[in-house]
Amino acid sequence: MRRLKLMATFLMLFLFRMSVCAQTELVYTPTWTAQAQFAGFYVAEAMGYFKEAGLKVVIKHPTASNTNANRLKSGESHLVSLQLASALEMMDDGSQLVNVLQYFQQSGLMVISRQPLKSLNDLNGKRVGHFRTGASMFVVAIGRKVHLDIDWVPFISHANLYLSGAIDATLAMSYNEYFQLKAAGQRLKKEQIIYLRDIGYNVPEDGLYVTKDFFKNHREEVLKFAEATRRGWEWAAQHPKETLDLVMLYMRQNNVPSNVYAQRWMLEECLKLLTDPKTGKRTYRLDPQAFDLTSRILYEGSIIKKPITYQQIMQP
């Protein structure tokens, strides 16, 4: 009964949102199409946390031709989710960004290989699939830093390259491509998998970003948005079943095909990534040491041309 009441509330809020779109003040864009990876934002909207903060928010998902990074640069979106590695690449290219909320404290990135892996050195001489941008560039940087000869094969977001036999190994997210491989019948053994977080590279990933200019001119609204989002993730962590229902509702509304099993897996994995590996708590703060590790590896691996400091990315 409780879940039915919540779903009725969600539906009413959807109708309300559609009625106020023309008065939108803030546009937020996640990294990809609707899915459980962005559950905290959906909860913040559906539970009225944005509205309580006096904000009118539209969640606008990106497309292949108009990414969240492009939307932020053009001003079409005011706030976006970015993996830390992506944010640093953008800053290296000249964008001035501010991290206003670091919700994923851990890395969900992993390497999956056809042959047993003892370390990343075993990728030497192999063809390895990787995402075109984002956290996978961190692994590319590690490979370059230690002079591994890896044939990197880019993909957008799917496990088909690995399933087709076109590559020897692939980078994957624990909450997405790993499930795709399991669902496709791959019986992966522990020795075929390396989690980056288990080998000293547990760097934070998804965070909330704005441009420095927008932050200076709309500081109060941005901080209210960040706090409402934090509340959304907290509610999601405490109500995973209801949150899953909400995610499926958002996916249907955005015409994104999926199934409840994949999204349940994704939500469970993403909720794990919220916790600080040192304390087990959800801090929503970018850890300086984890940031420095990310920036240093990207620089030493020639992904970025100059080191970026913690002070450059935090609130002025």
Regions found by a protein language model. Name each.
Residues T294-R296, E300-P316:
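Hinge/cleft segment of the Venus flytrap/periplasmic-binding protein
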Residues M1-A8:
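Bacterial N-terminal signal peptides that target proteins for export
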Residues A8-R17:
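Bacterial N-terminal signal peptides
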Residues A85-S86, S157-L161, G165-V256:
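Pocket-lining segment of extracytoplasmic ligand-binding domains
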Residues E45-G48, A53-G54, E76, S81-L84, ...:
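Sec/Tat-exported extracytoplasmic proteins
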Residues Q23-F155, A159-Y175, I194, N202:
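Short, glycine-/small- and polar/acidic-enriched structural segments
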